[in-house]
Amino acid sequence: MKDRLIGFIKTYCLFVCIFVLQKPLFMLFYKSLYPDASCADWFSVIWHGLPLDLSLAGYLTAIPGFLFITSVWTLSKSLYRIWCSYFLFISVLISIIFTVDLGLYEYWGFRLDATPLFYFFSSPKDAVASVSIWMVLGGIVAMAVYAVVLYAVFYGILLQKKLLLRMKLPYRRLKVSGILLLMTGLLFIPIRGGFTVSTMNVGKVYFSAEQRLNHAAINPAFSLMESLAKQKDFSKQYRFMEAAEADRLFKDMLEPAVAGGQTEKTDSVQQSADSLHTLFNTQRPDVLFVILESFSSRLMTALGGEPNIAIHLDSLSKEGVLFTNFYANSFRTDRGLVAILSGYPAQPTTSIMKYPRKTQSIPAIAGSLRKAGYGTKYYYGGDADFTNMRSYLMSSGFEDIVSDQDFPVTERLSKWGAHDHLVFNRLLEDLKTEAAEGTAEEKTPYFRVLQTSSSHEPFEVPFRRLENDRLNAFAYTDSCAGDFVRLGSLSRTYRQFVGRTLPDTSVDGGRCHPRAEAH
């Protein structure tokens, strides 16, 4: 049994080591992209990319795990041939994926996914038309060499007959089989990515505001596998009219000057920014977005909703500007966030946040404000890796993300992580610290986003004002927002602060209302 357990562990660790070594190889191959990368950057790429490596190694070790179980009952030559064939196939597969990824990244700007396969199978001739014959031959040679090297490593460490012959048929076969089955089952933990609400996804490795470092941390084989699992034909879902008809209708909605390609501005408001009305007393205010989980107009008396629920927001609506024609963009947080922060409409059957290759290209308010000199930070008490949220936030321009891992374990008591009052308190303490560290003249304006999570199933909150658990959870989040504004108003920087509260989605107590009522 000892030899089988050691062989199982060696197999898993060997896969992990191969994937880890691919990261510095990628960075060396594209050394022109990383001329100023420090040693810390190199180690950060390896460290943050490790979750995907551990997950993929788990997938690839599952079959050897069952082969080890089979070896408890038979040590036939057929089993040895199956063993060798599996690792030969894996060697070729890893070699093809890694080599193709190296070759295409220069042109595509993202790590390998299903896109090249789509183009190749749609039209193989056109797919390779822009590639010289020497590049194709060079790629094939590189694949072959890498596959041979990988198989030699597998053979030398795992497949030598003398190593396999050391294994004997055990006396307690059921016991040994049970232990090996348990070990194989434990691979589910790295495959899934732990026990949090989020499962393993490419976005989990995003850690830097520099996309080149995030891309280097991605495991291309995992990226390809995830992309194939999510492959959809979007053209069949959303192609409602011919392109010419769509262009004609869109052109009619544009201003004449824009539609005609003119550059001079004819409107008096367009000519001078000074003519625009403003509600601010400073040109570069600090900006805070508070994104309220599942809130709707039905919770606010000011918007015609039920009384005595969101009493603090009702009060604030009389002091600030109330938008009465603001509508929820979707019914899921991952879709609503992209609509709020990037102005990207939600799709009915999918979420763009789950496609890091797409989200890295869409504009976002965080990126625009960062270019304007703002410091950007995102606060969320839950798991920032849920539905690829981390990759979207880092790509969109947020320099730092505060999530559940930044709170003590004793404060992560809800299903979704830290309760809302703890997240608001963390934000308030950070703002006080930043205000104390610099003078008003040298202070960098900030853009902060706080996303709540307590007003979500199972609606368990450390607060009791209403009998209904669901409504009480909304009242709790409302009280957290009210306390934050009350305490924040005591700060000396409050006059330079612009706050905006809005919901991510609209969930209205299970009742269905016309879309026009889903504020």
Predicted features along the sequence, with ranges:
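Cytosolic-side transmembrane helix boundary signature
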Residues: 74, 145-179
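Hydrophobic cores of alpha-helical transmembrane segments in multi-pass inner/ER membrane proteins
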Residues: 55-68, 140-156
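Solvent-exposed soluble domains appended to multi-pass membrane proteins
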Residues: 255-519
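Hydrophobic membrane-insertion alpha-helices, especially the h-region
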Residues: 17, 176-190
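Membrane-interface segments at or immediately adjacent to transmembrane helices
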Residues: 119, 123-129, 184-269, 274
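Membrane-interfacial interhelical loops
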Residues: 22-52, 83-143, 160-167, 192-222
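Alpha-helical transmembrane segments and their helix-start/interface "positive-inside/aromatic belt" motifs
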Residues: 2-14, 78-92, 173-176
